[in-house]
Amino acid sequence: MKTAILDLERLPERGEVVINAEGHIAGRLATYIAKALLEKPGLRIVVVNAEKLVVTGDEKMVVEWFKRKISEWGTHYNPEKAGPKIPRRPDRVFKRMVRGMLPKRAESGRRALKRLRVYVSVPMELLSRKRLVVYEVPPAKLRMRPLAKYVTLEEVWRQVDPAAWEQWKKAQELWQKRLKPS
């Protein structure tokens, strides 16, 4: 697996680009990806390690914001039935961020969103590829302030939906055991 710096001007017009999202600010990476999807109609983008994306702000404030958004649309009888569905998993949260930056009523925006894949960690089908280039977004474009407060999407997910997070964590541990040579 090879890594390269992602530059919007030098992206291929067609094909697939794999972006490692580890340690990047979620909103800034989402704008970068939305712009690339709109400008290059033949390009497919795959984002891996979505759980390691960073949201700025105090952890308590960010988690409370997510919990409030989820609870204000739910009902006691059926919490998932009323109102818009608020994503809880990091991959779906990030895809929803990118969707908000695309023109969803225009055909170009709908097509662009279909060309985006977001994964929590790195899926096995990507690891098994022989010639895989994982792109890193340049840190100058996604700068993080020192001494600022940050929280990863995995930590938010752990507090908003602990049962799903526990299940994912157990599955990750099993995969790691399986991948280790005996």
Swiss-Prot record:
InterPro entries per the UniProt record, alphabetical: Ribosomal_uL13, Ribosomal_uL13_bac-type, Ribosomal_uL13_CS, Ribosomal_uL13_euk/arc, Ribosomal_uL13_sf
Task: Tell whether Ribonucleoprotein is among the UniProt keywords.
Answer: yes
- Give coiled-coil spans as residue ranges: none
Keyword terms, alphabetized: Ribonucleoprotein, Ribosomal protein
GO cellular component terms? cytosolic large ribosomal subunit
One GO biological process this protein is involved in is: negative regulation of translation
Q: List the disulfide bonds.
A: none
The entry lists its GO molecular-function terms as: mRNA binding; structural constituent of ribosome
The record's annotation in PANTHER family points to: LARGE RIBOSOMAL SUBUNIT PROTEIN UL13, RIBOSOMAL PROTEIN L13
Belongs to which family?
Answer: Belongs to the universal ribosomal protein uL13 family.
- Subunit structure of this chain's protein: Part of the 50S ribosomal subunit.
> What is the protein's known function?
This protein is one of the early assembly proteins of the 50S ribosomal subunit, although it is not seen to bind rRNA by itself. It is important during the early stages of 50S assembly.
Name of the featured protein: Large ribosomal subunit protein uL13
Name its species.
Pyrobaculum neutrophilum (strain DSM 2338 / JCM 9278 / NBRC 100436 / V24Sta) (Thermoproteus neutrophilus)
Gene for this protein? rpl13
